[in-house]
Design a protein with these regions (language model features):
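HotDog/MaoC-like acyl-thioester-processing domains
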Residues: 2-19, 102-104, 114-147
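Short, flexible micro-motifs
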Residues: 33, 70-71, 82-83, 115
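Hydrophobic core residues within well-ordered beta-strands of beta-rich domains
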Residues: 37, 48, 90-92, 108, ...
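A structural detector for beta-sheet-dominated domains
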Residues: 42-44, 99, 144-146
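Hydrophobic beta-strand-centered segment that forms part of the acyl-chain substrate-binding groove
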Residues: 76-109
Length: 147
């Protein structure tokens, strides 16, 4: 069903350097989702990036972001980048390496990059880092371009 929605043009679209369009309800980037992260990505060079500060609603242990939320940050940095470049893509495989606890209430820098491409298959990587450059999580994904 989701692939059919993408092919019909109902998937997330990016414009204005990363601002989400469409129904604006994407959990990661949609501005109209009251529970969403409202990430505002931009393209800088070969990176898709944003900064955010996670609220307490997204914590696991006291003061630490839930791993699923951190995984969402990484996935959006990778998949969203391809969509921002005008390609409709889905995540085929996602792996995450948690290096350090990701804190709640501190500025985080999220970056996604294309590592390699073979036809419709794109390998991507992403990081979540603190303001001082400490990487708290790394992601790698195999994305599939569906159109």
């Amino acid at each position: 069903m989701f692939v059919a929605q993408l092919e019909a043009g109902m998937g997330t679209k990016y414009e204005n350097n990363g601002r989400s369009l469409g129904d604006n309800y994407c959990f990661a980037c949609g501005l109209d989702n009251p529970y969403g992260l409202k990430l505002d990505f931009r393209i800088e060079g070969d990176c898709f990036m944003t900064e955010t500060t996670l609220a307490r609603e997204y914590q696991s242990y006291t003061g630490v972001a839930h791993g699923g939320i951190v995984s969402t940050l990484l996935d959006e940095a990778m998949g969203g980048y391809l969509v921002a470049l005008g390609e409709k893509a889905v995540t085929g495989r996602l792996s995450v390496r948690y290096r350090h606890p990701t804190p709640i209430g501190e500025t985080l820098k999220i970056e996604g990059k294309i590592e390699s491409r073979r036809s419709r298959f794109v390998t991507m990587k992403a990081t979540v880092a603190l303001a001082d450059g400490t990487v708290t999580a790394e992601g790698k994904a195999d994305m599939v371009v569906v159109e």
